[in-house]
């Protein structure tokens, strides 16, 4: 019975963290909408993780540092709240491996017809991943995953969870290239994959255009850089 109690406890903690983040978004809303608070929080988290993990292109480092400072000036006195929210996100991902940001986005009512952005319920992503991920994956023959419309990274997280549930170390058995036209989806994917230790290249752009990708449109997770956070 002990494993059942432990699993239940973890789900409760993960859910609690999600509820706390949604509450924090509502508290910070006022001058800016909840949608804008969410978007700026995720962007700030992505910029911070990327630069702290070591951005070896100094021009890109400076540009992302400037973007982060713009957010800090816009939300003066709130960056500590953003950091707390990132901490709660980390706890939720550790306790209940799923598309936490997609769930927050939908439960907070940020997805609507105006924005045109919705996120697939994670249980559906997981069922799809169970079919899609090959049975012969291992550290010597990792699963190479290309996600041309990543959203918040839900399908990638689902694939990682399938590997974990098979008793494999997904941090060594999964390599990802994820892309999305929407910057928010890029930031959401990058933050969650970084916190989960997934090796990934996350790109902003149209996967069907065939155009070259500029350096500032590419994010490498810490794991891709050889680090674990």
Give the location of each predicted region.
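A generic, residue-level signal for flexible/boundary positions that often mark functional hotspots
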Residues: 112-113, 175, 189
């Amino acid at each position: 019975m002990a494993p059942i109690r432990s699993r239940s406890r973890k789900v409760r903690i993960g859910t609690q963290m999600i509820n706390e983040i949604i509450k924090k978004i509502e508290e910070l809303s006022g001058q800016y909408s909840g949608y804008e608070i969410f978007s700026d929080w995720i962007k700030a988290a992505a910029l911070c993780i990327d630069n702290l993990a070591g951005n070896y292109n100094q021009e890109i480092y400076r540009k992302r540092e400037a973007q982060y400072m713009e957010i800090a000036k816009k939300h003066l006195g709130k960056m500590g709240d953003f950091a707390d929210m990132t901490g709660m996100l980390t706890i939720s991902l550790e306790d209940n491996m799923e598309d936490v940001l997609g769930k927050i986005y939908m439960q907070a009512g940020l997805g609507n017809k105006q924005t045109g952005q919705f996120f697939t319920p994670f249980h559906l992503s997981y069922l799809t991943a169970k079919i899609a991920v090959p049975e012969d994956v291992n550290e010597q023959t990792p699963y190479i995953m290309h996600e041309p419309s990543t959203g918040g990274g839900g399908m990638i997280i689902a694939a990682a969870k399938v590997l974990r549930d098979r008793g494999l170390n997904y941090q060594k058995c999964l390599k990802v290239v994820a892309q999305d036209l929407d910057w928010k989806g890029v930031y959401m994917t990058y933050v969650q994959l970084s916190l989960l230790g997934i090796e990934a290249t996350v790109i902003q752009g149209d996967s069907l255009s065939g155009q070259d990708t500029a350096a500032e449109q590419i994010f490498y997770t810490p794991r891709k850089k050889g680090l674990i956070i």
